[in-house]
Amino acid sequence: MTVIIKSMETPVEIESKSLVHWKAWRDAYDDLLPAEFQETMTLERCRFFSQKYPENALIAIDGMKVVGFISYGNFRDETIQAGEIIALYVLKDYYGKGIAQKLVRAALTALNHFSEIFLWVLKDNKRAIAFYQKMVFTFDGQEKMLELGKPIKEKRIVFYSK
């Protein structure tokens, strides 16, 4: 298996990223989020995000198949000059193969002009928390509540690049 990390460029890549987003979201959150909220994350909604922000995404390709992606950019809280990893998803069949690490490293390189790169993670997403801690992200104490059919807590985690 040779996985390439690259920018999304073609309509086929955008559509494939949408499908990965939809499938990987289900795998990642079916046990963490209420079913009624899960039903709102449709393939059409994933297409919307893929088409709206293609320049802020890198995809992982195995052969001709998109198997993961990362979305990143400026931190969405405009009062803080920092980068943000907005989304990271890899197909379940590709877990444990180093693809997520490659995607994160590529995004951190793209965001290396920031001294801090933030992301939000669900408090109960133990798999994601363990992964990011292995990648040297640390919790900074910030939390927020989301209303996703029931209250869900997110915690902010940060990577210090300088």
Task: Describe each PLM feature range.
Residues T79-A82, K97-G98, P151:
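Non-catalytic, surface-exposed connector residues within folded enzymatic/regulatory domains
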